[in-house]
Regions:
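Intrinsic-disorder/low-complexity signal
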Residues: 1-198
């Protein structure tokens, strides 16, 4: 097993690889299939717990454990250059400060560990790109990334071309129509009689 450092890469000896991302806190792990322009082709290339399968990439969640992104490199379409594996914190308002997530790359067929990576010096980040599985000269490699985002998974998804729906702003309470003006009181009614000095 190889312990990777940020920016390091190594060739993959397995056709099917699984990337587990674990931490002392609950993480949401996802995978994005990126074309040569560094963007998804459509929102279908965003693989996560609500959309657990894409072209050659699947998401699975272990009971009580971390999420896994599995990449079958033989089934990834030719137009896809890399699969980015991300992690975001499940707890609203939480950051990675003091949390050390570890990405473990395994052979998905025999479960042997190929590499691991723990991004260093995390702080205000709420989401990060952990590793990427990428195609180079017809072969597949893994690169340790560790790039953090302060705007969560939505920030990562937007950077890679996924359409992210902004949460709807709370609807303003309807305003009551203005009260109709009170009719003018006829002279002499509710006051001194007309022509009487006040």
């Amino acid at each position: 097993m190889t312990a990777m450092t940020p920016g390091s890469n190594l060739p993959l000896s397995a056709v099917r690889v699984a990337v587990d991302v674990t931490a002392p806190v609950r993480l949401d792990v996802s995978g994005l299939l990126l074309a040569a322009d560094g963007k998804v082709r459509s929102d279908d290339d965003f693989v996560f717990y609500n959309q657990p399968a894409g072209s050659g990439v699947t998401h699975s969640a272990a009971a009580g454990g971390g999420d896994t992104i599995t990449v079958d490199t033989a089934a990834v379409p030719d137009g896809i250059e890399k699969i980015v594996v991300t992690a975001s914190l499940d707890q609203p308002g939480a950051t990675f400060a003091g949390t050390e997530p570890t990405g473990t790359v395994r052979n998905a067929d025999d479960n042997s560990v190929l590499a691991s990576f723990t991004p260093p010096q995390l702080g205000a980040e709420t989401a990060l790109v952990v590793v990427e599985i990428y195609r180079r000269s017809g072969a597949w490699k893994v690169r340790a990334v560790g790039q953090g985002y302060a705007n969560g998974l939505a920030g990562i998804a937007t950077d890679f071309g996924v359409s992210v729906e902004e949460p709807a702003a709370p609807a303003a309470a309807p305003q009551a129509p203005p009260a109709p003006p009170a009719p003018a009181a006829p002279a002499g009614q509710w006051g001194p009689p007309a022509g009487t000095p006040a």
